[in-house]
From Swiss-Prot:
SUPFAM superfamilies: Creatininase. Fe cation 2 binds at H31, D40. It is an enzyme of class 3 (hydrolase). Requires one Fe(2+) ion for activity. It comes from the Archaea. GO terms for biological process: F420-0 metabolic process; riboflavin biosynthetic process. It catalyses: 2-amino-5-formylamino-6-(5-phospho-D-ribosylamino)pyrimidin-4(3H)-one + H2O = 2,5-diamino-6-(1-D-ribosylamino)pyrimidin-4(3H)-one 5'-phosphate + formate + H(+). GO terms for molecular function: 2-amino-5-formylamino-6-(5-phosphoribosylamino)pyrimidin-4(3H)-one formate-lyase activity; ferrous iron binding. Catalyzes the hydrolysis of the formamide of 2-amino-5-formylamino-6-ribosylamino-4(3H)-pyrimidinone 5'-monophosphate (FAPy) to form 2,5-diamino-6-ribosylamino-4(3H)-pyrimidinone 5'-phosphate (APy). Its cofactor is Fe(2+); Zn(2+). Gene3D superfamilies: Creatininase. This is 2-amino-5-formylamino-6-ribosylaminopyrimidin-4(3H)-one 5'-monophosphate deformylase.
Length: 221
């Protein structure tokens, strides 16, 4: 048996090796013209990996399936069961390398509907916590955050408009607005204020999010 040096490297504490970080977003979802279709997965992965590097917790990768409310039609999504099955796979393999606490960094609002099923995976010797970043879809905050991460095309901001791309702010998603008051309120805000790139806010937001998740890991030790 090899004697592993758990105290090596830049880590918070040796116990951080018991914590695994999982990114959760979406891969197939329209985000206007300036952001890619896998925006949520890339932002979640960026945050999760950076938190792993800062704390020493293990980055376990990104969940490929994603889910969504049935009335939100701006991409291709999977069932809740598909998402849970993939997470279970990561957890089962994470436990084989000594992980018993899992932090899921979720950056897709539709994935919040897995929470009830996800809670069933918690046991005395296995703790799972999902913390979500839910921004107005493809609007100012997500555009600015995308810039900070490095996935935004500034040139394409010229056409990044809800009048052209209905999913921006979900302004043109009539059924979603009718069935979800929160979505409708966000859409009205986008209609009123528009969408613009705020580079300073994007960098600040990214830094704050990473810092917040680092604190969550610290509290899990």
């Amino acid at each position: 048996m090899v004697d592993l040096r758990y105290g090596s490297g830049n880590i918070f504490d040796e116990k951080v090796h018991e914590i695994g970080i999982i990114a959760l977003g979406s891969f197939l979802e329209n985000h206007g013209s300036a952001l890619p279709i896998d925006t949520d997965a890339k932002i979640a992965s960026y945050i999760a990996l950076n938190v792993s590097i800062i704390t020493g917790a293990k980055f376990l990768g990104v969940v490929i399936p994603s889910t969504e409310y049935s009335y939100v039609k701006h991409g291709i999504h999977d069932s809740i069961e598909d998402v849970i099955t993939y997470i279970k796979y990561l957890i089962e393999n994470g436990r084989k390398i000594g992980i018993n606490k899992f932090l899921i960094v979720n950056c897709h609002g539709g994935n919040t509907i897995i929470l009830d099923e996800l809670s069933k995976l918690n046991f005395d010797d296995c703790f799972i916590q999902m913390e979500s970043v839910c921004l107005t879809h493809a609007a100012t905050e997500e555009v600015s955050l995308g810039y900070a991460v490095g996935i935004l095309s500034e040139d394409k901001m010229k056409t990044h408009n809800p009048k052209i791309y209905e999913e921006i702010g979900m302004v043109g998603l009539k059924e979603a607005r009718e069935k979800n008051e929160a979505i409708d309120l966000e859409a009205k805000s986008v209609e009123k204020n528009g969408v613009f790139l705020d580079k300073t806010h994007g960098k600040s937001l990214l830094n704050d999010l990473i810092t917040n998740y680092v604190e969550i890991v610290r509290n899990m030790i």
